[in-house]
Amino acid sequence: MSCKVKICGLKNREDARTAIEAGADYLGCVFFPPSPRHVEPQNAAEVFDMIGDADVLRVGLFVDPSDDQLMEVLNHVRLDIIQLHGHETPSRVEEVRLNFGLPVMKALPIETAQDVEAARAYDKVADRLLFDAKPPKGATRPGGNAIAFDWNLLTDTSWDSPWMLAGGLNVENVKDAIAQSGCKAVDVSSGVEAEKGVKSPELIEKFIAAVKG
Ligand SMILES: O=C(O)c1ccccc1N[C@@H]1O[C@H](COP(=O)(O)O)[C@@H](O)[C@H]1O
């Protein structure tokens, strides 16, 4: 089975169509106002509408959301997965799953072997895990910073929950990232952009081809 791909930070229909036609397995929209990739719920609904009957999952990315924020988005947008990319505790992850009846993918910041061990508190609690690089000091967002971590930290690790690799992936490094980490799914945002917050159709196509080719 080939490695799955999530294209995150989509803001318009055209980029969504490119990702779907190129073979993306997940599309992601960011609901975090400080991000250059933030979209309003109505806009996200238009992005996800491009999926139609295709076998592609809709992922909503949130950072320490309140139930009110989640409700506001879910009133307008059908999601298949809620991605929590902030400092949510294991009990908050359980609460979100329970309150909204949707699978939760918990993003976990990795820099050292200790960070990998700390992530185990979320294994089985979250439906899926997403390993991303720890953001640099002073960063204005906890992800989407085009920073990679040492993929070998994940080599031969074993998890009950399915997991994805993220953080600084791009057309040049994604094959090595898959080989070293042993991941079965990758997530990219910055690496398929022409400039911050602006996706490049050409890079989306090249990235997916590099993963699946
Ligand atoms: O993309 C963002 O702006 C963002 C904001 C807040 C939290 C996470 C964010 N992005 C996610 O971070 C990882 C890695 O992204 P990158 O490829 O290094 O840019 C990925 O899951 C993004 O969706």
Model features per residue range: what roles?
Residues M1-A185, S190-G213:
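Conserved N-terminal beta1-alpha1 strand-loop-helix module at the mouth
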